[in-house]
Amino acid sequence: TLQEKLATPAGQQAAQTLQQTGDTCELLDILANDGWLKNEYHGEEEIFTGLASLNDLVRLAAAMGSEFPFDEYAEVQKLPVIDVEFSHLVGMDACQGTLTLLDTPGPNEAGQPQMEVMMRDQLQKASAVLAVMDYTQMNSKADEDVRKELNAIADVSAGRLFVLVNKFDEKDRNGDGADTVRQKVPAMLNSDVLPASRVYPGSSRQAYLANRALHELRKNGTLPVDEAWVDDFVREAFGRMKKDYVCKDSELATEGATDLWEGSLIDQLITEVILSSHSRAAALAVDSAAAKL
């Protein structure tokens, strides 16, 4: 265990090195106080703390030269799970199956070859695979890295691959438009496995802010003026309009949130990828199994 490793001379030396570095000096605290370690976490803050601590534990294991038991988590059933109600599936037939969103490491995860094996295995088992690209990186020096990662994903997810080109809200007047993006992404692949219709330019940031605002307005009839995310929402939806003015007018806030949601272009992705995958869950499970043969 890491506690036993810490008691060795090599462990003590590693600990001293960690304590001297600003971004790693607090990693040892998770061994000194394991109160964060629970079987279940409830509420946003508890869940965030638990996941952050698990991430720190993996970093600590690597820093101390201990191999993390990635093979123990090869099955999705053994991974940490956040159980939430997905609002866009409310009211749908539960007999069609459940939706599990699995965030896998990138194909070229630096220094972690075990994660590449895990990633490929989980992608082969998935009913649908959503690759997330950064619009701002498409025409940069990182383009070749993006191309390699996308091809690595496409190799194991043919017929089940969809691509979200995120941060499309950062497009300026000289940037590629939506139609151009839909043509460019399939051209990055070595094989003809991705039709342009499965490429979705969009903004997850705008979608998140709009969806959260609409949820608050439906639930409470107003926006919580003192919460930081409301500042981001007002800035994104209304520009330089004063926050107090927006928060006092629920009809105006709802209209702005609705427009922001539509402008994010995420609705089409949810409809065509997530809802479609959910409605065809049984058939996709068979396709996924056949793809591994």
Each model region followed by its residue ranges:
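Globular "head" domains of long coiled-coil molecular machines
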Residues: 1-280
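Long, non-membrane, amphipathic alpha-helices that form coiled-coils
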Residues: 276-293
